[in-house]
Amino acid sequence: MAIPGSLGECGYIRTVLGQQILGHLDSSSLALPSEARLRLAGSSGRGDPVARSQRIQEQVQQTLARRGRSSVVGGNLHRTSSVPEYVYKLHLVENDFVGRQSPAARDYDMLKVGLSGWRDGSTLKVPCTSIKPHREKKTWIEALREGLEHTTDHTDCPAHYVYSHYYFNSKKSNILVFQHIKDKSLQRNAIILLSPEHCTCQHVRLIPSSVLPSLFNQLQLSPELYFSNMGTLYMTSIKGTLCIQLLKGKLPAKHQANFVTMAERRVYTLLLSSTTSSETSFRRTGDTLPSVTSGQSRVHGLHFHHVICDCLSRNADLEMTLERAVNMLDADHVPLSKISAAATFIQHESFQKSEARKRVNQLQGIPKLLQLLKVQNEDVQRAVCGALRNLVFEDNDNKVTVVLGKVNITKREGGGQAAGYMKETWKLANKNPVFLGLLWNLSSSDKLKHLMITEALLTLTESVIIPFSGWPEGDYPKANGLLDFDIFYNVTGCLRNMSSAGPDGRKVMRRCDGLIDSLVHYVRGTIADYQPDDKATENCVCILHNLSYQLEAELPEKYSQSIYMQNRNIQTNSNKSIGCFGSRSRKVKEQYQDTPMPEERSSPRGIEWLWHSIVIRMYLSLIAKSSRNYTQEASLGALQNLTAGSGPIPTSVARMVVQKENGLQHTRKMLHVGDPSVKKTAVSLLRNLSRNLSLQNEIAKETLPDLVSIIPDTVPSTDLLIETTASACYTLNNLMQNSYQNARDLLNTGGLQKIMTISIGEGYAPNKASKAASVLLYSLWAHTELHNAYKKAQFKKTDFVNSRTAKASHSLKD
């Protein structure tokens, strides 16, 4: 007689996707992806026809870039910088951070920095060839074309430089184009631009990545020639001179004196390259997940670090410090231009500097920044929120301080003030996606999730989730064009964190009107559009997965009464004829599990979607079609949660997966994927399904060889592999208990020797896998019909029944 399993360790299991899945990405804090286009601000020359034409080109190029991004929304899950890749309108005069007017936005100037010139002996020498200066106005594209025409791509000739003068809108600018240096590691061209000498402050103009392909098309040059082997981009400021170097690999130390000179005056790095070098095309690359923490993002294949824009003060005694910046955060006494500059300085100092984040908190800078969120000035709001976003990155204390509005608070202090700050933040977030980076970081803190659910859930659902998803009008996702995709993606990222807040948080989110409906509608739309790898779909499925956790136990009363009433009546009638085996008899279990589900609503609403057949098919479609590991894991995990238990909902979902939707075919394929987390979740789903007596033979026929194949030949050592092996053994145990034929099939697969090896485990300190293997062996010996077959296969009774296996089996009954 087979040994029955228990509802203990080998019973049903559930999962929930919280921020723990991001542990290998360095932090549970999720940062908002930086804006993909750079703001080119200015004020002069508005009537110039050439300028007007350039402005139109800019608008067209930015529109094409946005469309390009929306066409690859199924790309990577980017964890990028929590600071923008540029500094917004930081026009600073020396000494006191006073704001000034910005140049023309349509000039497309690459940069304007002051105090240009080379130092003898510390930088490049005077070029050996020159071009006569051109006095007429030229666009920067024409100027760059003429400069590049003097370069060649030969690597064996000596260093050669071309120097020329150009006038952009009557302002002189110098371009120096060099071919290469004798060192073979420098195989690419570099462009060094010297700004007009009369400029008094460093002013950066970077070309948006979306403009680069258009630029090289206009130059009739091959983009691949200049980008496919580029590797690394260096931009360094030397006494007000900006050097742009396109090199293959890192800059060798022996050339650093020429380009990254440490002169007597302070050097400010404007743009640092990635620390790793790779040959990258300017086109968007494949499905690799960035391994960076903050500060590095991929934009059209180029590796960028954040822009650090600082003022080169003529008086070293007035150098900006954190203390001075925090003291300037007073909207009543300090000009807004200085406040914006001070907030930007804090943003830069707190970027990847945990000491700076802690110092700002100690200086009481966070409450001052929070007060500035109310200032009706776009520059100030952008700078303040950028500073807050960096301050809370990977710093739970700062997150609590931001939300609750004061330092070292308790749960009873500052609630009202915090709510006010949060509401202001939600309003700002709805106006500009930049502010969503702050919300995303805050949502990763377990201490703040409940407060964010209370304060932000309804606003974000009504203003972002419902409009963008197209529900309830029935539009396809993104069809209405009312919102930018990045806004929807980042809001779903916030809700993904919030949905792991615990039972109370899950109940509130399930009750939120329109939330579940919109998430389901969006995911179904992406599947219909053949976009199962859409990155926002991953967030949506993770939210639904979390909301399905402990669903049966947390159902609202009105649903539990209607669903379980029929089940209670059948169970009462069955108890009258229970045999000597009590409620554990097979007859009673089959009657219990064959209880029909109440008729499904044709138009489900809210929580009803979570167990509806349409959503079950949606999960199976994503398992079959998506190549994103987290999407697969969340879909499998949602089904695992829904099949955990023996009530009407788990039983109905299990029958639907196995018998109606051919779900075993898709699930067994997930046992052989490379991602160990996906494999573990697939085994856990099979473990839950195998608890249904009426489905066991079908499951064994479909998946038995696959389950045996994933059991390792040796004792597993990693936690994930131990969990996977234990679930596989418990699944086999469920399938073997009541079926002599299934046990014989297991013997014929040749997997018994592996199970015995794992059962022995680590001697007197067995792990979960060895315990599960011992339980399985003890159950197999209960099939007396197979004793002779075991002996013919050279197995003895002591291989199945011994002190170790008996102890493991009996422990499940206690």
From Swiss-Prot:
Keyword annotations: Cell adhesion, Cell junction, Cytoplasm, DNA-binding, Methylation, Nucleus, Phosphoprotein, Repeat
Entry-annotated residues carrying Phosphoserine: S44, S82, S130
Tissue-wise expression: Expressed in the heart (at protein level).
Keyword Nucleus: yes
Keyword Cytoplasm attributed: yes
Domain of life, source organism: Eukaryota
GO biological process: adherens junction maintenance; bundle of His cell-Purkinje myocyte adhesion involved in cell communication; cardiac muscle cell action potential; cardiac muscle cell action potential involved in contraction; cell-cell adhesion; cell-cell signaling; desmosome assembly; desmosome organization
Protein's name according to its UniProt entry: Plakophilin-2
Quaternary structure and interacting proteins, as annotated: Interacts with DSC2. Interacts with JUP. Interacts with KRT5/CK5, KRT8/CK8, KRT14/CK14, KRT18/CK18 and VIM. Interacts (via N-terminus) with MARK3/C-TAK1. Interacts with DSP. Interacts with DSG1, DSG2 and DSG3. Interacts (via N-terminus) with CTNNB1. Interacts with CDH1. Interacts with the RNA polymerase III (Pol III) complex proteins POLR3A/RPC155, POLR3F/RPC39 and POLR3C/RPC82. Interacts with CTNNA3. Interacts (via N-terminus) with SCN5A/Nav1.5. Interacts with ANK3/ANKG and GJA1/CX43.
Region (Required for binding to single-stranded DNA): 1-329
One GO CC term, this protein: intercalated disc
Major location (coarse): nucleus
Molecular function terms, GO-annotated: alpha-catenin binding; cadherin binding; DNA binding; intermediate filament binding; molecular adaptor activity; protein kinase C binding
InterPro entries found in the cross-reference section: ARM-like (IPR011989), ARM-type_fold (IPR016024), Armadillo (IPR000225), Plakophilin/d_Catenin (IPR028435)
Protein source organism: Rattus norvegicus
